[in-house]
Curated annotation (Swiss-Prot):
Annotated keywords: Leader peptide, RNA-binding, rRNA-binding, Transcription, Transcription regulation, Translation regulation
Family classification: Belongs to the speF operon leader peptide family.
The protein's name in its UniProt record: Leader peptide SpeFL
Function statement: A small protein (arrest peptide) encoded upstream of inducible ornithine carboxylase gene (speF) that controls expression of downstream genes (speF and potE) by transcriptional and translational attenuation. Its expression controls transcription and translation of downstream SpeF; translation pausing at low Arg levels on this mRNA prevents premature Rho-dependent transcription termination of speF and also enhances SprF translation by preventing sequestration of its ribosome-binding site.
Pfam families, per the entry: SpeFL
Length: 34
């Protein structure tokens, strides 16, 4: 249980980073397109 609880935050942080990176890439692509 402890391991699972400690592993959950990591997954959430990774998802957040991936989301942020994806959004940054999208904005950059839009900026480049313009």
């Amino acid at each position: 249980m402890e391991n699972n609880n400690r592993f959950m935050p990591h997954i959430r942080r990774t998802t957040h980073i991936m989301m942020f990176a994806h959004r940054n890439s999208f904005d950059f692509h839009f900026f480049n397109a313009r």
